[in-house]
Amino acid sequence: MPYKVKDISLAPQGEKKIRWVQEHMPVLERIKSDFSEEKPFKGVTIGSCLHLEPKTINLGLTLQAGGAEVAMTGCNPLSTQDDATAAGAKMGLNMYGWRGETNEEYYENIHRVLDHEPEILIDDGADMIFLVHRERPELLDGIIGACEETTTGINRLRAMAADGALKFPVMAVNDAYTKYLFDNRYGTGQSTFDSIMGTTNMLIAGKTVVVCGYGWCGRGIAMRAEGLGASVIVTEVDPIRALEARMDGFRVMKVSDAVKEADILITATGNTDVVSESEFMNMKDGCVMANSGHFNVEINREALEELSRETGKVKEDIEVFIMPDGRKIYLLAEGRLVNLASERGQGHPAEIMDMSFAMQALSARHLLQEKPDPGVYRAPDEIDLMVARMKLDAMGIEIDELTEKQRLYLENWEEGT
């Protein structure tokens, strides 16, 4: 199998990591077993643009077990784990990617995956989907559809569909209950602080943590910050989410006011310039900033650099920016996705990604079976419920079922008081 990775000799180390996550991804392992018998992807090429680490390699192996030829590249220049890509290549996957890619290399690797002429795409952030529309239109007729993992990617694709520019169907895997209620909330909450604490060795208890954005990712971050003993401030542009954050017990204020108190500031909005010039001018001395959104646009690093009288690297993944008045502001992982782009970041726990990648695998099979028209589609409820039931089963949990009388009662509109 063709591959382009940093060091193929790292494969044994990566294989150990993959075997470990497989033991903690029982739903995906069950699907892998089913796929190995059914071969739903026999003769199909699947191209993915995902964070290349042990859990995503396991997804690739699941698709491979289903008969697919799989080509994989990374969706972030800093999130690739080189031992995992080496192991994936040794296991028969077409791997393209390494940690520390330049922007040019990043897009070259996406093109390398597209050179395999995939019929199904699995994307995280929609860069591959956009690239095939803009630069490889000759491939569009051969693409059955795609699955998108993130809120950011789905927002971009819905805008594309609204303009009539989307040429094939996309399954919004992010909109599945078994994805966003767990991956976005519990996964992001835990992995964000795993990475921040591992990178900085800071104590969270007693700190003021500002969380920009109160979607499902922001909720998870705020919840974990509070659990670690921090005082939490939430910033929002949506009045309903802001009200919800206040009712959940957090202080709510404008970003411009919150930065004056922030010991740690974390962005999770999916939008651009959330923290920029005016915020940097008023930011508390010693504030540590991190981004948990998909793209590195939420914290305006360029503006921060221009405002600074001096910049430097404190240690791996920690930059310092010294302002004209002597204040120091710290930025983790270049403002990229901190839970994966940081050297210490391992991404979400395997038990969480078990559900998200189960949804990816089953949604890809659904695309192949149904071949819907171009557009953005929510994954069918039956797939969502199937994944939830398999996860409960793997956890040894049994739940009740409605009796026939209860079912009829819920369906009957005539009964009242």
Curated annotation (Swiss-Prot):
Describe the reaction catalysed, as an equation: S-inosyl-L-homocysteine + H2O = L-homocysteine + inosine
Q: Which cysteines are joined by disulfide bonds?
A: none
Q: What is its EC number?
A: 3.13.1.9
GO cellular component terms listed in the entry, alphabetical order: cytosol
Residues holding substrate: D124, E149, K179, D183
| Protein name listed in UniProt | S-inosyl-L-homocysteine hydrolase
Cofactor remark from the record: Binds 1 NAD(+) per subunit.
SUPFAM superfamilies with a match to the protein in the record: Formate/glycerate dehydrogenase catalytic domain-like, NAD(P)-binding Rossmann-fold domains
Q: Which GO BP terms, alphabetically?
A: one-carbon metabolic process; S-adenosylmethionine biosynthetic process; S-adenosylmethionine cycle
Question: Mind listing the UniProt keywords for this protein, alphabetically?
Answer: Cytoplasm, Hydrolase, NAD, One-carbon metabolism
